[in-house]
C-alpha cells in the first residue's frame, strides 16, 4: 500500500476554551480529490492552517508523504510542495493577470528580480502561459487583476498556487461567491488540475462537493463525524442530521445516494 499524501495523528488545536481541531487522525490517499465538509465552526480552515504551517498544533503530528512536517514554517512547507488558497482572495490588483502569475512564480522559486521583465525569462514565460491555460484565463492575460470578475479572481489565485507545480493543493472554498456559470467553469478546471495534482478542498456547495470529490470527510466540532465516498456520505444519517439535512439539500442528497 502506498504512503498517504497527507496523514495526521491526534492533531489538536485549541483557542482558549474552544477546541477547534479535536484529536484528529486522518489519512488521505494520493491521486484523488478529497473534500472536507462540515458546518461553520467545524474546524475545516483551522485544519488547513495546521497543515500549511500558519498555525502550530497544541498536540499531534502532521505528515506529508511520510515526512513529519509538524512545526515547519509556512514557506518551508510551501517549498516541500504544498500550496493553498485562502477564503479571502489575495491578488495584486494593479498588475496584469500574467504578471500576477509571473511575480508569484519568481518569488516562490527564490529568483525574484524586480528589474527583469517576464519576457526575458523564457522558462518563467512558459510557466505563465501553461498556467493561464490551466485556469482558463489566457484571453485575459493582459487585464489588470483588479478589473476581473470575482470568479476570474478566484481562478487567478488558484493559478498563483499551481504555477510552481505543487504536488498537493489545498483549496479553501474556491467557488464561494461565484455565479453558477463561474462555478461550473471552476469545477471543470479543478477536475483538470486533479489529473496531476493531489487536491484537498473545503467547500460548502454540495453540488461542487459531490460533483468533484472522490472521498469526503465530514467534520463536526473539530472531530471526524464520517468519512467515505460521496454516495456513502450522502446515505449517512449522522451527516444528514448534522449537515446535509437542510431542505434545500434534500433533492441533491437523493441524487447522490442513487448515483
Outline where the language-model segments fall:
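Glycine-rich phosphate-binding loops of nucleotide-dependent enzymes
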Residues: 2-259
Amino acid at each position: 500500500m502506498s504512503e498517504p499524501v497527507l496523514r495526521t495523528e491526534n492533531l489538536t488545536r485549541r483557542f482558549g476554551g474552544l477546541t477547534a481541531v479535536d484529536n484528529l487522525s486522518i489519512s488521505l490517499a494520493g491521486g484523488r480529490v478529497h473534500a472536507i465538509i462540515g458546518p461553520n465552526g467545524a474546524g475545516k480552515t483551522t485544519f488547513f492552517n495546521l497543515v500549511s504551517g500558519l498555525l502550530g498544533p497544541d498536540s499531534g503530528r502532521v505528515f506529508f508523504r511520510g515526512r513529519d512536517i509538524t512545526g515547519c514554517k509556512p514557506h518551508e512547507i510551501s517549498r516541500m510542495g504544498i500550496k493553498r488558497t485562502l477564503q479571502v482572495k489575495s491578488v495584486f490588483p494593479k498588475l496584469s493577470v500574467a504578471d500576477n502569475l509571473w511575480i508569484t512564480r519568481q518569488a516562490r522559486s527564490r529568483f525574484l528580480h524586480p528589474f527583469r521583465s517576464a519576457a526575458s525569462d523564457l522558462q518563467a514565460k512558459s510557466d505563465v502561459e501553461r498556467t493561464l491555460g490551466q485556469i482558463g484565463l489566457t484571453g485575459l492575460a493582459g487585464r489588470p487583476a483588479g478589473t476581473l470578475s470575482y470568479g476570474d479572481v478566484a481562478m487567478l489565485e488558484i493559478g498563483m498556487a499551481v504555477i510552481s507545480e505543487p504536488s498537493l493543493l489545498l483549496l479553501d472554498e474556491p467557488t464561494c461567491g461565484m455565479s453558477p456559470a463561474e462555478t461550473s467553469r471552476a469545477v471543470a478546471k479543478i477536475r483538470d488540475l486533479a489529473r496531476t495534482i493531489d487536491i484537498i478542498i473545503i467547500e460548502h456547495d454540495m453540488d461542487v462537493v459531490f460533483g468533484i470529490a472522490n472521498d469526503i470527510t465530514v467534520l463536526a466540532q473539530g472531530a471526524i463525524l464520517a468519512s467515505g465516498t460521496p454516495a456513502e456520505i450522502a446515505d449517512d444519517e449522522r451527516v444528514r442530521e448534522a449537515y446535509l439535512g437542510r431542505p434545500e439539500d434534500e433533492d441533491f442528497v437523493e441524487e447522490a445516494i442513487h448515483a
